[in-house]
Amino acid sequence: MRIMLLFTAILAFSLAQSFGAVCKEPQEEVVPGGGRSKRDPDLYQLLQRLFKSHSSLEGLLKALSQASTDPKESTSPEKRDMHDFFVGLMGKRSVQPDSPTDVNQENVPSFGILKYPPRAE
């Protein structure tokens, strides 16, 4: 969860830096005819997107902070199934205190005693 929070912070800083660099440019260019240049509508749309993304970014940060405060309750059955699947692939089993694993040695197949041929030197 910390990785997700770190990624969000880096994303927020990079967005703020990129939009900050755009806003530092001159906002209004005067055309000799007394009108405004064609960049003004684009700048207006860019500022609108910045404002909309700021509010959605706040919502994203709120959701991430709520998720990071209580990570144990947010585990879904799908996530648990995927965890069990990968643990099974790796061959590692965690012993749960409520489910002991007793292995009966009689039921375990064995290859018997391995005999090596005498060394020929």
Swiss-Prot record:
Record's superkingdom?
Eukaryota
Q: Which residue numbers fall in the propeptide?
A: 17-78, 94-121
* Comp. bias regions, Polar residues: 96-108
Q: Which GO terms describe its cellular component?
A: extracellular region; extracellular space
One annotated GO molecular function = signaling receptor binding
Changing residue 90 to T does what?
In HH10; has markedly reduced activity
- Specify the signal sequence span: 1-16
Q: Report residue spans for region: Disordered.
A: 93-121
PANTHER family to which the protein is assigned, alphabetical:
TACHYKININ-3
Biological role stated in the UniProt entry:
Tachykinins are active peptides which excite neurons, evoke behavioral responses, are potent vasodilators and secretagogues, and contract (directly or indirectly) many smooth muscles. Is a critical central regulator of gonadal function.
What is the protein name for this chain? Tachykinin-3
Q: Which organism is it from?
A: Homo sapiens (Human)
